[in-house]
From Swiss-Prot:
Bilayer-spanning residue ranges: 23-43, 49-69, 95-115, 117-137
Protein name: Golgi apparatus membrane protein TVP18
Predominant place of localization: Golgi
Superkingdom of the organism of origin: Eukaryota
Organism: Candida glabrata (strain ATCC 2001 / BCRC 20586 / JCM 3761 / NBRC 0622 / NRRL Y-65 / CBS 138)
Subcellular location: Golgi apparatus membrane
Top-level taxonomy: Eukaryota, Fungi, Dikarya, Ascomycota, Saccharomycotina
Function field: Golgi membrane protein involved in vesicular trafficking.
Keywords assigned: Glycoprotein, Golgi apparatus, Membrane, Transmembrane, Transmembrane helix
Residues bearing carbohydrate: N22
Any GO CC annotation of this UniProt entry: Golgi membrane
Length: 167
């Protein structure tokens, strides 16, 4: 039995999220996109022969931090220090996430002072996440998790036996 990515994605949850008009969910979606962009574009900018390398390294670190912020389940399964876990748990509200993403976007916009590179895309997508969380904060919307990724407690979630067969 082959295990596909579609077994972990809840299409009905995607439609439910779109209809909710909860901007914290939209911020979370862009957060997922930012994880990949930060790591990929951070690595891509390591090959410049200028100070942009420092911003590329910062981009990679930002991607890893966003990974733990947007996917809190990883805090339970990865061996991390208590100080790091406390730091990540500070960003469990829309207001703090708005501030966090804004500061990270500003750092990436500062890379433009050295050279215009693809890190500009990081600044833009981080800004979109910040704006989404900011709108959710100003509208007093509850912080919500997305329904796109299936919960391990769902009945149709692939369990250990399926993973063992795949391996």
């Amino acid at each position: 039995m082959a295990l596909g990515i579609t077994q972990f994605i809840n299409i009905a949850g995607l439609l439910k999220d779109l209809k909710s008009f909860n901007f914290s969910v939209y911020g979370k979606w862009f957060g997922y996109i930012n994880i990949f962009l930060c790591i990929a574009l951070g690595i891509a900018n390591l090959f410049h022969v200028s100070a942009v390398i420092a911003f590329g390294i910062v981009g990679i670190v930002q991607g890893l931090i966003i990974l733990f912020i947007e996917i809190p389940f990883l805090l339970k399964i990865c061996p991390l220090s208590d100080r790091f876990i406390e730091f990540i748990k500070r960003f469990e509200t829309n207001g703090y996430r708005c501030i966090f993403y804004t500061l990270m976007a500003i750092v990436q916009y500062c890379s433009l002072a050295v050279m215009t590179t693809s890190l500009l895309v990081l600044g833009i997508t981080l800004t979109i996440s910040a704006v989404s969380y900011g709108i959710a904060f100003t509208k007093h919307q509850e912080f919500a998790n997305t329904n796109i990724i299936k919960n391990p407690t769902d009945e149709d979630f692939p369990h250990d036996a399926v993973v063992r067969e795949m391996l």
